[in-house]
Amino acid sequence: MMKFIGIIPARYASTRFPGKPLADMNGKPMIQRVYEQVKDVLDSVCVATDDIRIENAVKAFGGQVVMTSDQHRSGTDRCYEAYQKIGEGYDVIVNIQGDEPFIHPEQIQTIKTCFADANTQIATLVKPFRSDDDFESSLFNPNSPKVVLNKNNEAMYFSRSIIPYIRGKKYTEWLPSHTFYKHIGLYAYRAQVLKEITQLPQSALELAESLEQLRWLENGYKIKVGITEQETIGIDTPEDMEKALAFLANR
């Protein structure tokens, strides 16, 4: 049986929303809600942070937490340091966004299934855009990266631009005429692959698009893609939190 550990990178010093992991959501800090959403579908879960306030909050609700450097450029780097400190013994590390308190356990199961294929090195998730999605706020939104897949459900490219370009049709006809995929920022890596990719220098495409997964593709790694119909709600700003609290109240 393969063993899966979920690591939740959590920084206090967010530019747009300082202290975000500790933001109160109906009596629980957001980081606790993320932790509780995923803990039953993984062999182990751990928060990786660089801030003692987050460490204390996780310990207070009985979660596992590891202190990491404040110099990491990405959540992937923080995951690898945490994995080294926890001690090895897991086959796959799942990198879980600390600002998605409604992440669905089914999404974790979908990404785990990708590793039934012994050749899977890295896996991530996508969600198809709906044909009735608002074009401007969905497909045109650079904060919602798009993905194109090959016949083996591997990522060929990720972009903040719209890919593919539909020639000969008006923009308004694009969504009904083609299945576009939105990237969901959940990753999983085999342990050895995680070690390798954290040692790669930043790549030209990564710097151009500001998408770290392009570094892996540029260096020849394959990214298996699981398809989910579950929507995720990422919280980047205090305004996003207001919407999330309204969603929580209506559940």
Swiss-Prot record:
Protein name, entry field: 3-deoxy-manno-octulosonate cytidylyltransferase
UniProt keyword Transferase, yes or no: yes
A Pfam entry, by short name: CTP_transf_3
UniProt KW Transferase keyword: yes
Pathway: Nucleotide-sugar biosynthesis; CMP-3-deoxy-D-manno-octulosonate biosynthesis; CMP-3-deoxy-D-manno-octulosonate from 3-deoxy-D-manno-octulosonate and CTP: step 1/1; Bacterial outer membrane biogenesis; lipopolysaccharide biosynthesis
One GO molecular-function entry: 3-deoxy-manno-octulosonate cytidylyltransferase activity
Catalytic activity entry: 3-deoxy-alpha-D-manno-oct-2-ulosonate + CTP = CMP-3-deoxy-beta-D-manno-octulosonate + diphosphate
